[in-house]
């Protein structure tokens, strides 16, 4: 693996077929708050490239990015999904959710939970999305419209997932980070659960882009290759 950042990564987005946008935390010496840096990793060249905040917001929130980001305040922390009608669903790590219409107006908010435990993350799957419920050892697929539960894999007394805390997806698999030390994957076609054949320490996120994977940890980010 190649280390690509020494800072905590708070968001990763697909930018194109061979590029990803990363957002890294930047400490603010004058206060307890923090700023962020944005950069692109080009998988073809292995180089970092400059990207603007506006390009990141456009990719994440669509054409009404200005209106949505201003209403959110902290716009890097939630997962986001742009729906077919250009409405945008967001979910924060604590389970807080919001739905913005195509004009960028907040039309619905609430808390997404399962058995009173918060559900977080968005991994897109057609007109659905996958999320994790760490407190219930469950990975759940929801219909994006209305956030209604479709499929649940795992459960509090099952061994399929151990404290799942992050989920992402590519065209074929859903990737689930468990207990900060392993990654499991769900086949989207069969719902079979298997292990990713690598083990990582202190993992906070796992994003697959073709043959490449971005692995985020407590101390930075790495690029791995099949």
Model-found features: residue ranges?
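Structural motif
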Residues: 30-40, 96-99, 137-141, 182-184, ...
């Amino acid at each position: 693996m190649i280390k690509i950042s020494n800072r905590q990564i708070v968001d990763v987005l697909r930018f194109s077929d061979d590029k990803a946008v990363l957002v890294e935390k930047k400490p603010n010496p004058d206060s307890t708050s923090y700023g962020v840096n944005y950069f692109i990793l080009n998988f073809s060249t292995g180089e970092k490239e400059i990207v603007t905040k506006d390009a990141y917001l456009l990719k994440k929130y669509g054409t009404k990015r200005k209106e949505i980001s201003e209403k959110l305040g902290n716009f890097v922390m939630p997962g986001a999904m742009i729906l077919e009608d250009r409405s945008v669903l967001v979910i924060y790590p604590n389970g807080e959710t919001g739905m913005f219409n195509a004009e960028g107006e907040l039309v619905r908010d609430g808390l997404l939970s399962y058995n009173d435990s918060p559900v977080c993350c968005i991994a897109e799957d057609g007109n659905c999305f996958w999320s994790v419920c760490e407190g219930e050892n469950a990975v759940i697929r929801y219909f994006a419209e209305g956030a209604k539960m479709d499929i649940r894999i795992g459960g509090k007394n099952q061994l399929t997932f151990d404290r799942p805390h992050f989920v992402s997806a590519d065209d074929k698999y859903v990737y689930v980070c468990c207990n900060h030390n392993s990654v499991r994957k769900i086949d989207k076609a069969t719902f079979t659960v298997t292990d990713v054949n690598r083990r990582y320490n202190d993992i906070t996120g796992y994003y697959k882009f073709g043959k490449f994977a971005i692995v985020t940890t407590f101390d930075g980010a790495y690029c791995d290759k099949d």
